[in-house]
Design a protein with these regions (language model features):
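N-terminal interaction/assembly modules
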Residues: 1-122, 126-150
Length: 150
């Protein structure tokens, strides 16, 4: 549950970044979050949220490329910002956080999109993340190693 709250914090940060509301330093400071939210997740949770945000932003081109390649008759620019933030952080986790089981990453993404997205977004997110996982497993999607925020 603690990691879920950290993922929600990371999702909120990535949403704010995409909406142009915060720059990277502001996001990583987490000063924009409520004191209650920060207290609930503790220092380990804050570190995990920062890792997801910094890693996602450092690999944004590779992550967006992976998402774009799996969109059928759709453009990434047309995705709603909630869904895009959830997809970005989850694709980052699938590609770079190998210590976390993919089913946990996908389940958390679906739950967060159900809570914050529209009625249909969780199905779409589940499909895209399932395709990313499958393509990673088959070696179709190859991760370019580099600074992944780890």
């Amino acid at each position: 549950m603690a990691r879920r709250k950290s993922r929600i914090l990371a999702f909120q940060a990535l949403y704010a970044w995409d909406a142009g509301m915060k720059d990277t330093d502001d996001l990583l400071s987490l000063q924009w979050a409520s004191a209650e939210q920060l207290e609930r997740i503790g220092e380990d949770g804050r570190a995990f949220a920062r890792l997801i945000v910094s890693g996602t932003l450092s690999q944004i081109e590779q992550i967006d490329g992976a998402i774009k390649e799996r969109l059928v008759n759709w453009e990434i620019e047309r995705l709603n910002k909630v869904g895009l933030a959830v997809l970005r952080m989850s694709v980052y986790s699938l590609m770079f956080q190998k210590d976390i089981h993919p089913s946990i990453i996908i389940d958390e993404a679906v739950d967060i999109s159900r809570e914050y997205g529209d009625e249909q977004s969780y199905r779409f997110i589940n499909g895209i993340l399932g395709a990313v996982k499958t393509d990673l497993d088959k070696g179709i999607l190859v991760v370019r190693e580099g600074s992944a925020g780890q």
